[in-house]
Amino acid sequence: MFNSISGILSGKTTDSVYVENSGIEWEIFVSALALDALGTVGKEVKVYTWLYHREDQMRLFGFPNQAERSLFLDLTKVEGVGPRQALKIMSGLNSSSLEKALEEGDLDTLQKAPGVGKKTAQKMILALKGKLTNLNEVSSKGQASVSCEYEDIVTALTEMGFERKSVIVQVEKIAEEMKAAGSDPLKNEEELFRRSIVALS
């Protein structure tokens, strides 16, 4: 129903943001890391959304880019992990660390996320290892889109020892966040490179 909402970031709480668009102020629930990524109050933002609808409530969940939304939706496929729990997990681990832990079956890293014990971590690995939407999409696209625009950065990060598929996913995410904040990634490659290193580390 909603793919994204663009407007002025009019407020923040500990677990949500308010975005004003055409006289309507939307409350959108986000992870702690997304709260920081979306920038400061008063700026124009674009938030990718997912609508949670039950008989007794409707909630909008938001993400700074489409890749994080895909990861969130993957997490909600795990038995016992609902939307609020998925956001908590994404508040404790950045998407790169989370995807890497799921792909490598790293129980210890997954258990660092809020509310994730050994059993939940095992369920997450069983449900999602080798099945993450973002990494599968990178493979199916043949890495073409990133190769065209950001190949120098991808190559540099890969040579530093980071896994290429994870690098591509992160570079795409951060480039999209920069565009949403009004910054051109191609003109600010140093920032894109620096933020990618932080996200991958």
Swiss-Prot record:
Subunit structure: Homotetramer. Forms an RuvA(8)-RuvB(12)-Holliday junction (HJ) complex. HJ DNA is sandwiched between 2 RuvA tetramers; dsDNA enters through RuvA and exits via RuvB. An RuvB hexamer assembles on each DNA strand where it exits the tetramer. Each RuvB hexamer is contacted by two RuvA subunits (via domain III) on 2 adjacent RuvB subunits; this complex drives branch migration. In the full resolvosome a probable DNA-RuvA(4)-RuvB(12)-RuvC(2) complex forms which resolves the HJ.
Principal cellular location given in the protein's record: cytoplasm
Family membership noted in the UniProt record: Belongs to the RuvA family.
Subcellular location as annotated: Cytoplasm
UniProt GO BP: DNA recombination; DNA repair
Annotated protein name in UniProt: Holliday junction branch migration complex subunit RuvA
InterPro entries: DNA_helicase_Holl-junc_RuvA_I (IPR013849), Hlx-hairpin-Hlx_DNA-bd_motif (IPR003583), NA-bd_OB-fold (IPR012340), RuvA (IPR000085), RuvA_2-like (IPR010994)
Free-text comment on this protein's domains from its UniProt entry: Has three domains with a flexible linker between the domains II and III and assumes an 'L' shape. Domain III is highly mobile and contacts RuvB.
Region of interest: Domain II: 65-140
Species of the source: Treponema denticola (strain ATCC 35405 / DSM 14222 / CIP 103919 / JCM 8153 / KCTC 15104)
Region: Flexible linker, residue numbers: 140-144
A Pfam family per the record: RuvA_N
Region annotated Domain I, chain positions: 1-64
NCBIfam families given in the database record: ruvA
